[in-house]
A protein has these predicted regions:
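Class I S-adenosylmethionine
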Residues: 73-189, 194-207
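Active-site-adjacent beta-strand anchor residues
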Residues: 35, 168-169, 191, 216-219
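S-adenosyl-L-methionine
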Residues: 198-232
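Membrane-interfacial entry segments at the cytosolic side of transmembrane helices
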Residues: 62-75
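Membrane-embedded alpha-helical segments of integral membrane proteins
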Residues: 10-60
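Intracellular juxtamembrane helix-capping segments at the cytosolic ends
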Residues: 1-3
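C-terminal membrane-cytosol helix-exit motif in multi-pass small-molecule transporters
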Residues: 50-64, 80-87
Length: 232
């Protein structure tokens, strides 16, 4: 910067680059990188880009000094190859990791314990979002309480009066499986915003047309589906 005019030009260029970087940094990871390569590798990709930019700038100023840092990306790449092959979060004790995926919405894990129970964990893994067992339907957890929902209708009310069900927040199908066992093969609409969770449910929780033919799944926002469905 040699004068006021060039200072304004440089400042404008910096702000333009900053704005472009903000847009790329906002949309590229969320829409492309994280769903395709995961959070950890996304960090490594952006770290590599920043290193290349910094290295190029330093090389223009002092090539000899820049060459001292060539080893850094090589070491980081080798460490990533050898240390990042395992799961982001290890499974619980006495459990096996069956499925791990980072979608556009969630970090998804499915684990199976030594008694054959399968569990759906999302993101930080503090809560169980769905549970499944080949021979059991009721687990003494939160989902069991939803079976009482029809009895909030005006009495007298009998189980055969339950004609259909809408679930917003389907996860991998614990609630519809329970409803089918209690109230029969009633039509069920299940809404889950994350299509990867629906796919995992079909593969690992029997949430498919063969085992739950009366269940229709929607990979949509719940508010949108409420406005689109004409059932009451």
């Amino acid at each position: 910067v040699s004068d006021v005019e060039s200072a304004g030009k440089v400042a404008g260029q910096i702000y333009a680059i900053s704005t472009l970087g903000s847009l790329v940094g906002t949309f590229l990871p969320v829409l492309i990188l994280i769903p395709d390569i995961g959070t950890t590798r996304t960090f490594l990709v952006f770290a590599g880009i920043l290193f290349v930019i910094a290295f190029a700038g330093l090389f223009r100023v002092n090539a000899k000094l820049a060459l001292r840092y060539v080893w850094m990306p090589i070491v980081i790449t080798l460490l990533a190859v050898f240390l990042l092959n395992g799961p982001l979060r290890p499974p619980a004790p006495n459990a096996t990791l069956l499925y791990e995926k980072e979608s556009a919405y969630n970090y998804i894990q499915i684990q199976e314990d030594d008694k054959g129970y399968r569990y759906l964990y999302l993101n930080e893994g503090q809560g169980i979002h769905s549970q499944w067992h080949p021979t059991q339907v009721f687990y003494g957890r939160t989902w069991d309480f939803f079976l009482t929902a029809p009895y909030f209708n005006e009495p007298p009310f009998t189980p055969d009066q339950v004609q259909s069900l809408l679930i917003i927040g389907l996860a991998t199908g614990t609630i519809p499986r329970q409803y089918i066992n209690v109230y029969g093969d009633i039509p069920i609409d299940g809404v889950e915003i994350d299509p990867q969770i629906i796919e995992a449910g079909a593969e690992f929780f029997q949430m498919n047309k063969t085992d739950m033919p009366s269940l229709t799944t929607y990979a949509q926002d719940g508010r949108y589906i409420l406005n689109q469905l004409d059932k009451k």
